[in-house]
């Protein structure tokens, strides 16, 4: 029986659901694990290899994992603050919708999303790039990855009720070391 971490990110083509179909074919002992297409990391986090070489062509994805590995305390603080803001905004929005069910009510998470998306496209020092990547991954419409002709991420807000920043754990950070 394998004991495993869950993947942190939604990723198109992720293998989390397929793992039961092939895990019996994975050797239990090996010297080093190689993962050239890390993506959401479902297999990597499931196996929790002691020695691994991982990569991906998506620079922002790799930056997320590098910052998770190297700057976990700062990432954790920034994610906790975004989580707090998101929950506060959602509570306010749901209260407004309950009070005015037939009215259009502002969801401040939408403005928060577009502010973070702007930072994703034009990084500032306000947030780690990995934090903006995680936030976009969890709050964009259907978790889509799409860029316009200028190379800017342009997926709209997904209107999710929850942001689970607790998916990012110290155990994930330590495994990446």
Segments predicted by a language model, with ranges:
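S-adenosyl-L-methionine
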Residues: 1-37, 42-43, 47
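Class I S-adenosyl-L-methionine-dependent methyltransferase module
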Residues: 50-177
């Amino acid at each position: 029986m394998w004991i495993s971490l869950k993947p942190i990110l939604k990723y198109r083509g992720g293998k989390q659901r397929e793992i039961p179909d092939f895990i019996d074919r994975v050797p239990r002992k090996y010297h080093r694990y190689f993962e050239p297409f890390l993506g959401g990391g479902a297999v990597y986090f499931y196996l929790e290899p002691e020695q691994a070489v991982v990569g991906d062509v998506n620079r922002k994805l790799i930056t997320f994992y590098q910052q998770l590995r190297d700057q976990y305390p700062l990432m954790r603080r920034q994610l906790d603050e975004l989580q707090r803001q998101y929950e506060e905004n959602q509570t306010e929005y749901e209260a407004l919708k309950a009070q005015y069910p037939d009215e259009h009510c502002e969801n401040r998470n939408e403005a928060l999303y577009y502010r973070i998306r702007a930072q994703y496209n034009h990084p500032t020092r306000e947030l780690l790039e990995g934090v903006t990547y995680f936030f976009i991954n969890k709050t964009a419409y259907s978790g889509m990855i799409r860029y316009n002709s200028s190379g800017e991420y342009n997926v709209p807000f997904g209107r999710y009720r929850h942001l689970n920043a607790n998916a990012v754990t110290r155990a994930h950070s330590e495994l990446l070391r």
